[in-house]
Amino acid sequence: MSSKKAKTKTTKKRPQRATSNVFAMFDQSQIQEFKEAFNMIDQNRDGFIDKEDLHDMLASLGKNPTDAYLDAMMNEAPGPINFTMFLTMFGEKLNGTDPEDVIRNAFACFDEEATGTIQEDYLRELLTTMGDRFTDEEVDELYREAPIDKKGNFNYIEFTRILKHGAKDKDD
C-alpha cells in the first residue's frame, strides 16, 4: 500500500516538474522580457493569447495576416496559450536552434580575415543568392536591429549572442 502512495506522489509531481523546468530554462530578466512580450500580445488582457490577439498584434506591426496564417500559428500550441504555455513554446523553439558555436562558425566561413565581422553588402549578397535564399525585405528585417558598425561591418559574434541570449538594454 505504501508503494501505491509513492507511485501516486511521483505521478502528481511530474507535471509540476515539467512546468518548473520551463522557468528554469531562462534567467529572471529573460522571463520578465517574455512576460512583457506576452502582455503586449494579449490585447484583451484575459491572460490568454487567442487568434484575435495575434491578429491585432500583427496588424499593429503593419501586417495583414490571413485567417489560415493565424490558424497555423495557433495550431502550434497544444492548448490555450497562457504565459506558461507561451514560455514553453519559446523554450522549445530556442532549444531547436543550433548551438551558439555552430551559428558563429557558419558565419566565420565567410570571414576570411577572422575579424568577427562580415561586410553587410557581402552578407546581403550571400543571403539572397545562396542556399535558402532570403528576400531583400527579409534581409532588411534582419539588419534592422543587427549589430552593424558605421563602416557597414556586420558583427556576427554579437549577432549570435543576441540570437541565443537576447539583446542587451541600451542602458547597459
From Swiss-Prot:
One GO biological process term: regulation of cell shape
TM regions (residue ranges): none
Ranges annotated as biased composition (Basic residues): 1-16
Pfam families attached to this UniProt entry: EF-hand_11 (PF08976), EF-hand_7 (PF13499)
MF terms (GO), sorted A to Z: calcium ion binding; myosin heavy chain binding
PROSITE patterns membership: EF_HAND_1, EF_HAND_2
Keywords in alphabetical order: Calcium, Metal-binding, Motor protein, Muscle protein, Myosin, Phosphoprotein, Repeat
Region (Disordered): 1-20
Post-translational modification: Phosphorylation increases the actin-activated myosin ATPase activity and thereby regulates the contractile activity. It is required to generate the driving force in the migration of the cells but not necessary for localization of myosin-2 at the leading edge. Phosphorylation is reduced following epigallocatechin-3-O-gallate treatment.
GO CC terms in record: apical part of cell; brush border; cell cortex; cytoplasm; cytosol; extracellular exosome; myofibril; myosin II complex
EF-hand domain location: 29-64, 98-133, 134-169
Keyword Calcium: yes
Assembly and interaction partners: Myosin is a hexamer of 2 heavy chains and 4 light chains: interacts with myosin heavy chain MYO19.
Further comment: This chain binds calcium.
PANTHER family: MYOSIN REGULATORY LIGHT CHAIN 2 (PTHR23049)
Designated name of the protein: Myosin regulatory light chain 12B
The species this protein was found in: Homo sapiens (Human)
Recorded name of the encoding gene: MYL12B
